[in-house]
Structure formats: C-alpha cells, structure tokens
C-alpha cells in the first residue's frame, strides 16, 4: 500500500514536514509495510517557503536581518534554480522578517514596527542571483505602508528638512519627498509575484489601519493617525509614481505592504 501525506503546518506548533512525519510514523505503526511518502503543503501563509522550496527541489537560505522591532532576527527564504520556464526565483514570506509572532504582546505597536528586514531579504536574494520573486504578505506586525522594505532597497523617504523619516508607521506623516536615485540598480531586472488573500484598499474604513491595526497593538487613536498618515503617503506616492493606486484591491494587505509592491 502506498500512502501520500500532505498536510499544512499547525500554526505555532509543527511545520508541514514535522506534522507529515508524525502521521507517517503513526501509519507505519498500523501498516508497517506501507510505502509512506511525505510532501510539504502550505496555503500561502506560514510554511510556504519550506513547502515550495523543498517541494520544488530548491534550497533554504538563512540570513540575519532587521526584525520588526529593529533588532536582528534570523530569517529564512527559499531559492529555486533557474530552468527553461523561469529565472532563478526567491520565495519570501514577509512574516519571516516582520511577522507578528516576532513581537511579544506587550511590545506590539505599529507606530514603531518596521518592514526593513523584508527589503534586506530581497536584497540578499538579489545578491544571490535571483531576479524573480514570489512574496507572501501577511501575518505582519507592521503598518508602515512598506516604506521600511523600500528604504532597505534604496528608496529615500525624507522629511521637510531633508532627513530620513523614522522607521515604522510613525514616519509616514513626516514624509515630504520620495527619492529613487539610490535604489538598487538590479531592482529594474526583477519581477515580483505577490501572494495575498485579502482585497482591502490602503486607507479608509476597510483599509489596513482600521481592519488590521488593532490586532497589531494599535489603539483607536493610533488607527486614526495611521490611516491619515497612509493617505498622506499614498497621495505623495501618486505625485512621484503615477501608477501608485491606493484603491487597488490588496494594497491594504499586511499594513500597506501591498501598496509598496
């Protein structure tokens, strides 16, 4: 008898492969002669990197990046080798560098948490030769509109005095100018496919701050301030980059990370 085990991860407990291995061991207790094959599975959230990288014959890369609180964390991403159908591809979960599970309950504050580490993951993958990206956005501790990620990739967000704005949602309202002169030149060679399961716009009553801000530690006052700051950021982005559209479905995903992409 042949048995194929493919199970999603059990959040905060077992990875897809760990859960599959446990089931395999149970099956073999009852059917010792069974040929049991374990394959990773994921739904785009936790465990997606491992599932795609291992399931498609890729490799896992570990790198130290800036975590959501500004402290170093070790994050993982996957690399798929180039073949006839795709260039060398990186698989990234933003939650590996900016996830809410990286922030203790008492420290959750989207005014200060940053996506800078996500940009560092992308930069590391570019340095490793990747030019196509599959990025899962979700499970974030952030509401910074993705500016942290963009800062790590060389975009400059400057205040009225020409100084870089602070990391986190607190820096959004201070943005007076966006400059792209220092962006990584390799970024022009890259393509991104964003994995997202929500359609929220960036701002407003169904926007990222109102819907997801409270679970990230935002008070009602913070939600109002963050929403106004994201609107300011979106309007300035539209002046700088004509294609920026804060109403596009999914731009409010992961604290506005969808808008950044």
Residue ranges and their predicted role:
Residues 1-137, 141-261:
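N-terminal loops that bind phosphate or other acidic moieties
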């Amino acid at each position: 008898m042949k048995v194929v085990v493919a199970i999603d991860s059990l959040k905060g407990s077992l990875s897809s492969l760990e859960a599959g291995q446990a089931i395999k061991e149970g099956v073999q207790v009852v059917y010792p002669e069974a040929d049991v094959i374990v394959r990773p599975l994921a739904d785009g959230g936790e465990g997606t990197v491992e599932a795609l990288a291992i399931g498609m014959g890729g490799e896992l890369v570990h790198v130290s990046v800036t975590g959501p609180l500004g402290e170093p964390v070790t994050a993982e991403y996957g690399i798929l080798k180039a073949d006839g159908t795709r260039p060398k591809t990186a698989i990234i979960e933003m939650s590996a560098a900016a996830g809410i599970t990286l922030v203790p309950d008492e420290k959750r504050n989207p005014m200060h948490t940053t996506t800078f580490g996500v940009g560092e993951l992308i930069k590391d993958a570019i340095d490793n030769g990747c030019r196509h990206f599959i990025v899962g956005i979700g499970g974030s501790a952030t509401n910074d509109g993705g500016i942290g990620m963009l800062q790590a990739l060389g975009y400059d967000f400057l205040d009225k005095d020409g100084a870089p704005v602070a990391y986190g949602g607190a820096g959004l309202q201070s943005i007076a100018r966006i400059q792209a002169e220092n962006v990584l030149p390799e970024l022009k060679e890259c393509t991104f496919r964003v994995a997202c399961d929500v359609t929220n716009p960036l701002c407003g009553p169904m926007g990222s701050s109102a819907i997801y801000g409270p679970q990230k530690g935002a008070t009602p006052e913070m939600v109002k301030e963050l929403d106004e700051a994201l609107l300011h950021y979106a309007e300035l982005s539209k002046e700088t980059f004509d294609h920026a559209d804060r109403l596009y479905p999914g731009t409010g995903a992961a604290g506005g990370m969808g808008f950044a992409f």
